[in-house]
């Protein structure tokens, strides 16, 4: 009987039901299929990368712009996760992506975003990854970013801070950014956040 069960037994039962539910959703080959929800930075960074590479696709730009606009909150910001607080870096990237999508800076939703960005420290207060996107877009100086020497990959596994002690996602990110940062490329996008 449930009313006679101890808290530990109730927790154990809940855990087993959750496990069984997940195993029931697993495909025979061992994988799960489901929706992956993310924030607007993936779409914003995709548009920034496409602009950097010169890969203009009006349909993709329009779709990304619609998605980013649909996730903007009433105060002009975007969050990092559903229901989360406003995030400065996410808002800066979304704003720039919408400018690339053709949104005018004096449009009410853009003015709200820009004013919020300014009130919360501006681009100077964004995370390093956002400032790297800004540098690639000619909106931030590479001189004002941390330097990660690509030679870092040569450090042996026994050395402190060697890349083999990092998670695979961190290793891929840091090595790629170290290489890009050593070249310091910039392709001005002809817009600003001001």
Regions found by a protein language model. Name each.
Residues 1-194:
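Preference for long, amphipathic alpha-helical scaffolds in soluble/luminal domains
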């Amino acid at each position: 009987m449930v009313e006679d069960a101890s808290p530990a037994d109730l927790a154990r039962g809940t855990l087993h039901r959750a496990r069984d539910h997940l195993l029931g959703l697993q495909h025979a080959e061992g994988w799960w299929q489901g929706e992956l929800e993310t924030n607007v930075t993936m779409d914003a960074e995709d548009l920034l990368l496409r602009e950097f590479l010169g890969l203009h696709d009006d349909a993709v730009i329009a779709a990304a712009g619609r998605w980013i606009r649909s996730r903007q909150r009433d105060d002009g910001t975007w969050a990092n996760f559903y229901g989360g607080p406003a995030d400065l870096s996410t808002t800066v990237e979304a704003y720039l992506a919408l400018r690339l999508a053709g949104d005018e800076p004096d449009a009410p939703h853009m003015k709200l975003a820009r004013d919020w960005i300014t009130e919360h420290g501006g681009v100077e207060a964004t995370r390093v990854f956002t400032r790297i996107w800004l540098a690639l877009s000619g909106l931030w100086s590479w001189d004002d970013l941390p330097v990660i020497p690509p030679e870092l990959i040569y450090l042996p596994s026994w050395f402190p801070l060697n890349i083999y002690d990092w998670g695979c996602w961190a290793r891929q990110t840091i090595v790629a950014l170290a290489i890009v940062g050593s070249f310091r490329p910039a392709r001005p996008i002809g817009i600003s956040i001001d």
